Amino acid sequence: MTIERITSENYQDFCDMLYWRAKGKEEKAPIEDVPDELNDRNLYVYAAREEGRFVGWISLTYLPKVSRVKKGYVYVDELWVAEKYRNHGIAKALIAEADEMKTKLDATGIRLYVNENNPIAHNLYTACGFSGEDKAYFMEK
């Protein structure tokens, strides 16, 4: 297994994986343009390649803080691994990218939200050193 940062060069393979996740079948995904967001200095998307294709990904965002400390947080926006490839260390390898990003950016920490009805993800994050303090509500407008 290898972990790759998503760029314009491997974006088609990444889209193929997203299509596979959404449609349940592996085939070339139609794409128009590589999104400009991939060049955002605070967005990091990594994917795990196994058997010649991407089988999971993590999307990370660095959110700077305006304060005396001037250190922000790395946020895990999404983490997904294809069911066939779960329990093979892929999710932990992807989370390791968040740890590296935290170190590289000298961030205060890593934050994420996990649904309380998702015990598999909760157990994964706990095994990777995350701890929960309070329940939170996800709200959207």
Regions found by a protein language model. Name each.
Residues V81, N87-E100, A127:
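Conserved acetyl-CoA-binding loop-helix of GNAT-fold acetyltransferases
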